[in-house]
A protein has these predicted regions:
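Extreme N-terminal starter segment of soluble prokaryotic enzymes
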Residues: 2-6
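N-terminal glycine-rich anion-binding loop in soluble enzyme alpha/beta folds
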Residues: 7-45
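Short beta->alpha connector loops
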Residues: 11-14, 52-54, 73-77
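Short hydrophobic/aromatic-enriched beta-strand-loop microsegments
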Residues: 27-32, 48, 91-96
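Glycine-rich, highly charged phosphate/nucleotide-binding loops
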Residues: 44-62
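Glycine/small-residue-rich loop that forms an oxyanion/phosphate-binding "nest" at active or ligand-binding sites
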Residues: 59-106
């Protein structure tokens, strides 16, 4: 059975956990902004692309993907908005993996 071609915008431990749960037949490309992000993804069944991309870079890199899962850090709002916009242009399914808000208890 042929799997999906998935792009994961990494940058959190949730991205690593997500990739670990994806079926082996899926072809996963993880996008990490830094070399440190790449080291966190070592040992996962994915290809890792390192470096910050602008909208044109994502337009090129995401062509041919079946879906994009944005598991970037909550503070990485620029990459989230850029990827969301590019996915809309390419009519590519976009999913945001979010974190639950933690409220400080006093």
């Amino acid at each position: 059975m042929k799997g999906l071609r998935l792009a994961v915008i990494a940058g959190t431990s949730e991205a690593t956990d997500l990739i670990a749960t994806l079926p082996e037949q899926d072809s996963v490309t993880a996008f990490a902004a830094t070399e440190y992000g790449k080291t966190i993804l070592e040992g996962q069944h994915c290809m890792v692309r390192v470096g910050r991309l602008d909208a044109d870079g994502f337009r090129f890199a995401l062509r041919g993907m079946d879906a994009v899962i944005d598991a970037s850090h909550p503070f990485a709002q620029v990459v989230t908005e850029t990827v969301r916009q590019v996915c809309a242009e390419l009519e590519l399914p976009y999913f945001r993996l979010g974190r639950q808000k933690i409220t400080k208890c006093v």
